[in-house]
């Protein structure tokens, strides 16, 4: 899905953001450690080569262990809370209004501690993002 050129499109927030979402499945049975994320997502922009995506994502509390994060991502938390604990044992917790980045190859626990709504922009080199 590529985006039209020369267009401006607002990105919904709050209840409108959640209403625009449909089911997604980034969390796999292999990575899931606890809970059921019941993920939902809305894609707002995809590059012509499908390697760069901007979207909104929602998840219920859950935890997963990620061996090799697939891309470079910027995230802004709109609602809820998330704790990221790298293999070095350092934990970072983010809540509404906080932003963070994850780099390709990151390893650690990705734990949603309160129902989460986030906006993200991710670049996944190599194969197109699915």
For the regions a protein language model found, what residue spans apply to each?
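A short, N-terminal "cap"/entry segment at the start of jelly-roll beta-barrel domains
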Residues: 1-51
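Beta-strand residues in well-ordered beta-sheet regions across diverse protein folds
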Residues: 55, 77-78, 85, 111-113, ...
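Short, conserved beta-strand element in jelly-roll/cupin
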Residues: 68-84
């Amino acid at each position: 899905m590529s985006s039209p050129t020369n267009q401006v499109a607002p990105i919904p927030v709050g209840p409108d953001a959640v209403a625009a979402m449909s089911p997604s499945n980034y969390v796999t049975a292999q990575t899931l450690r606890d809970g059921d994320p019941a993920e939902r997502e809305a894609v707002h922009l995809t590059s012509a080569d499908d390697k760069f995506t901007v979207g909104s994502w929602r998840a219920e509390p859950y935890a997963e262990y990620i061996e090799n994060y697939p891309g470079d991502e910027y995230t802004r938390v709109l609602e809820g809370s998330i704790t990221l604990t790298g293999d070095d044992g350092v934990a970072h917790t983010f809540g509404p209004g906080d932003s963070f980045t994850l780099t390709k190859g990151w390893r650690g626990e990705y734990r949603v501690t309160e129902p989460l709504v986030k906006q993200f922009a991710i670049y996944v080199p190599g194969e197109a993002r699915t």
